[in-house]
Amino acid sequence: MNTANASLPPRGALRYLSLCVLTTLYSPLATASEPEPVTTLQTITFNARQYTPAKQTENVRHDSSVKVQQADLLNQYLPTVAGVNVGGTSGMDQHIYIRGLGSDNAGSALKITVDGVRQPETRGFHHAGISGLDPDLYKTTEVSVGNNSVTLGNNAIGGGVAFTTVDAQDLLLPDQKMGAKVKLGYASNDQQFQRSLTTYAKPNDQLDMIVSYSERDSDGGEDGKSNHIQGDDITIKNILAKVNVMPAEGHKITASYQSYDNDGNYPFRPNIGYQANLPANIHPGYTNNETYALGYEYKPHSNFELNSKIYHLTNESLSQGLRGTTPMRIATSGKTDGMTASIKQQLTQHHGDHALTHTLNYGVEGYKKSATLESSDITEDATSVGVYLQDRIELGRFALTPGVRFDHYKPSERLSSDDYNQLSGALAGEFKLTPNHSLFASYTQLFNGPPLPETIHQSGQTFVNKDLEAETGANAELGISSRFQGVFDSQDSMSLTAKVFDTQYDNKIDRLTGIDCATGNTVTGGQCASYINAGETTVKGYELSAKYRLNNMRLNAGYAHAKSETEQGYQLNKDSGDQLNLGFNYDINDKFSLGSAIRHVKGLTRRTSATAVADLPSFTTYDVFGSYRPSALPQLTVDAGVYNLTDAYYYEHVSNTGDKAMGRNVKVALSYQF
C-alpha cells in the first residue's frame, strides 16, 4: 500500500501581495447590454453565445467575442484568461496550460470536462494532442486558475476547465416553442468554410431538446511568412443531441450524445509543425471522440440541489508517417466510464441579530480510464474514486470554507502493484473590508496519481517504473478584489482584482528518453522512455485584472506572471513569458457593435536542463471585430473580424518552436435564426 502524506505543511510563505491597479481588464468577452461575467475568487466564467436576459440562470450569460470571432479552436479564445495558455496550431495538437501545467507527455495536470464528463487524460502519441474540443458548441467556459477546491480532485493539480454545452431554452426566442439556426462562415487564411444547422424545441414545461450539426473544411492555412501550417484537406464534424425531461417539479433528467471527428492530411508529428515534417511525413490522420451521458438533477428549492451523472466516452486516433526511415502507423483507442454525484445545500442559523449560513457541497466522483494500442494486445487502465466535503461558513463580513477529500487511485498491475490513497484538505477565507472591497486567501493540498503512459509506448518502448510515487503538493493564494462606482462619470463602474500564488509540487512526474529497456537506466542509445519522480517544483507568480464600463463601452485589461523552479534549479518546459491582454468593446446601437483586442507575450529565456536553453521571443497580436444586425431582418446576424491584423510571425511559448501560429485571418459569418 502506498499512502501519500496527508499532512503537507506549506513550504514557502507568500511574501508579497501585488496591489497594482490597471485601468482596464482584458475581456473582449462582453457587451454592455448584458451583466458582467461571473467572477468568483478563484474561478472565471464566461460565455460563448448570445442569450436573452429572460433566460439567464445562476451563471450570468452575456455576448462574448467568442461568438464574434467564430472561434473553432481553443487557442482562439482561452488565452484571454490570465494565467492560461493554449499550445498547438491545429485541432490535432491542442493543449491547455494553466500556470505552466497542462496536458503533456508526463500526463495531465488539469481536470477538463464537458458537461461534467472527464475528457481523455492519456495521449495516444506524445507529438499529438489529447482530445478534440469545439468552442462552437459551448455556452459557458469555467476556468479554475489553479486548484483551490477539494471538488476538483485527481488529475487537477494545476486547475481545471469546465465546458457546458447549449440547451434549447438558451436559443429559443421569446414566445417560441421551437426554432432553428443556420450558420455559414468563411475564414480567409485557411480557406475554411463552415456550415451548421441547429434545431431546438420546448413544446411544454416538461420537455426540451436540441440537435446541432456543424462541419468545417479547411486547407490548414499559413503563418506570418506565408509558410503552410497545420495540414491539408481537413474536415471537422461536430454533433450535439440533448434532451431534458422534467417529469415533476424540481426533477430533471438529461440524456445527451456528443461527437467530434477531425479527419485530414496531418503531419506525423503535429506538434513540431507542418514544415518540419516535409516532405514525406504528411499523411492521413484523424481523431474522434464520442460521448453518451445520462444525468439527473433534483432541485426542490433554492437551498438544495442534487446533481448526478453517468457517462461513457470513447476516443480514437491515427497518426502515420516515418520514424527515421521506419514507417509507423499509430492507431490508438481509449475509453472513460464514469459517474459523479454532488449535493449543494444551504443552511441558515440565527443567533440574535446575526445569521450564520452554511453552504455545504459534498459528493463522490469515480471513473475508469483505459488506453489501447491497436497493433498490440496491451491495454492499460486506471481507476479513480474520490469523495469530498466542503462547507462555506458565512457570518457577517467573514466567510470561511474548509474542505476535505479522500482519493483512491489504482493503475493496472503492469504499471504498479500498489494503489494510491490520499487524504487532502483545503481552507479558504474571505473578509469584506466594505461591501465593495474584499480580501481572500486559500490553501489547498494537491494529489495526482501516476498517469497512464502514452498509448504508443505500450508496445515495449517504455520501461515501466513500478516505484513511481503520486504527485502531491499544495497551492496557496492571497488577493484583493474591489468594485467602484462613479469613478470618472456618474454612470461608470470599475472592478479590480489582484492575487499572488505560491504552488509547491512534490514528486513531480516527468518523462525521460534514452532509457535502457532492460534496466531502466539512462544510457547512450537507449531506445525506451520511462516516467520518473523528478523531485520538488515551485511555481510562483501573480495575476492582475481590472474592468471598466461606461454605458455601452467597455475597456478591459489583464496581466499574468508565473515562474517555475525545479529542485535542480531549472524551469518547467512550458513556462511562458508574462502576458498582457487589452480589449475594447462598444455597442454603437442595437444594430452595430465593435471590438478590438491586443495580446502581448513577453520574451523569455527558459532553461530546462544544463544543456537545454531556449530564448523565446516576445510577440504581439491585434484583433478587430464587429457585429451587425439589420433592422429589416433582425433574425440575421453578420459577424466579421480581422485577427492577427499585422500578420505577426510567432509561436506560442507552450508550443514547439516549429509550430508557428496562423497569420492574418479575415473571418465572416452569417447566422439566421427562425
Region spans (language model):
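Flexible loop and strand-edge segments within Gram-negative outer membrane beta-barrel domains
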Residues: 220, 224-226, 230-232, 236, ...
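Membrane-embedded beta-barrel scaffold of Gram-negative outer-membrane proteins
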Residues: 184, 299, 305-321, 439-440, ...
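Gram-negative outer-membrane beta-barrel transporters
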Residues: 358-360, 395-400, 493-504, 523-609, ...
